[in-house]
Amino acid sequence: MFENYPFWYTFFTELKYQVVLSPTSTRKIYELGIESIPSESECYPAKLAHGHVTWLIRNGVKFIFYPCIPYERNEFPDAVNHYNCPIVTSYAENIKNNVDELNDPSITFRNPFLAFTSEEILANRLVEEFKDIPAEEVKAAVHKGWEEMAAARRDVQKKGEETLKYLEDTGRHGIVLAGRPYHIDPEIHHGIPDLINSYGIAVLTEDSISHLAPVERPIRVND
């Protein structure tokens, strides 16, 4: 959601779908889906997904799109890989098999396996998935979404550059708070960025400044 939403919103809007989001994560959202969580060992973002899907169902949404995405964009050509964790890769299968309300025949729950490896690979897969829509329309929507995703990333980078300049001009301090995209969710990050801000320290995400310097290799992690 937090990484690829610009793409999906643009893609579905171009195809004349109305995009409906569940509300911001809260404890109530978590509790809404707690009965369908199959294991306490799952990470909190996965548990929250049950509540978000349940909210959509109970608010009359009849078409829910929750793709399984093994591979993200290959942002750095010399990176070893660009795969997601097992939860992101296939958790929609867990949702499908544990949220009983999805058995309602009036609800369409679509969870295709897709790869964000490249625009071409993603477009070809979505053409297969949306066979009732002309292929050229699907490909055009993918292209628009891909451009919007790139523009959103440039906006993040621009803000990072602006923040660094502000720190240089004012002599203030900043911190790079690294994490996964879902750490933008206030229910998951528990207010840590706000706490840091309260001390007069700027918070930057790694993707807001990673373009400013090359990665020193070799590095001692599998990236």
Regions found by a protein language model. Give the residues of each.
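An N-terminal assembly and electron-transfer interface module characteristic of large anaerobic redox
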Residues: 1-223
